[in-house]
């Protein structure tokens, strides 16, 4: 009976450790993006922001706009001065340092 309890304990323990390690692997993947908050200025558009961020053409402009719209809960693609937006940028991207309004 002790052997059966030991086997069950080892099995449950191994399962829990496996789930824990899987969660660590999933959450610690190397994301090439970072996210910054910016304050929209007069004359800014999502297309203009897409052009500034996407100088390397690493992401489609429409995909960028869709991402920003979805992750900022925007009802449309229109943005207003004073809006605070979270946008994805590549790590070490000069855009992050060029914006005077990075939050």
From Swiss-Prot:
One of its GO terms (cellular component) is cytoplasm. Residues 36-87 form the LysM domain. GO terms for biological process: division septum assembly; DNA repair; negative regulation of cell division; SOS response. Inhibits cell division during the SOS response. Affects a later stage of the cell division protein assembly, after the assembly of the Z ring, by probably suppressing recruitment of FtsL and/or DivIC to the division machinery. It is found in: Cytoplasm. InterPro entries: Cell_div_suppressor_YneA (IPR022887), LysM_dom (IPR018392), LysM_dom_sf (IPR036779). This is Cell division suppressor protein YneA. The keyword Cell cycle applies. Signal peptide: none annotated. Belongs to the YneA family. Keywords: Cell cycle, Cell division, Cytoplasm, DNA damage, DNA repair, Septation, SOS response. Gene3D superfamilies: LysM domain. The keyword Nucleotidyltransferase does not apply.
């Amino acid at each position: 009976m002790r052997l059966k309890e030991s086997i069950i304990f080892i099995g449950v323990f191994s399962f829990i450790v496996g789930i824990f390690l899987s969660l660590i692997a999933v959450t610690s993947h190397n994301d090439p993006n970072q996210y910054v908050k910016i304050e929209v200025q007069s004359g800014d558009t999502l297309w203009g922001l897409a052009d500034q961020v996407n100088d390397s053409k690493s992401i489609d402009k429409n995909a960028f706009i869709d991402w920003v719209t979805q992750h900022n809960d925007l009802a449309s693609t229109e943005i207003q001065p004073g809006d605070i937006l979270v946008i994805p940028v590549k790590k070490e991207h000069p855009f992050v340092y060029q914006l005077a309004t990075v939050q």
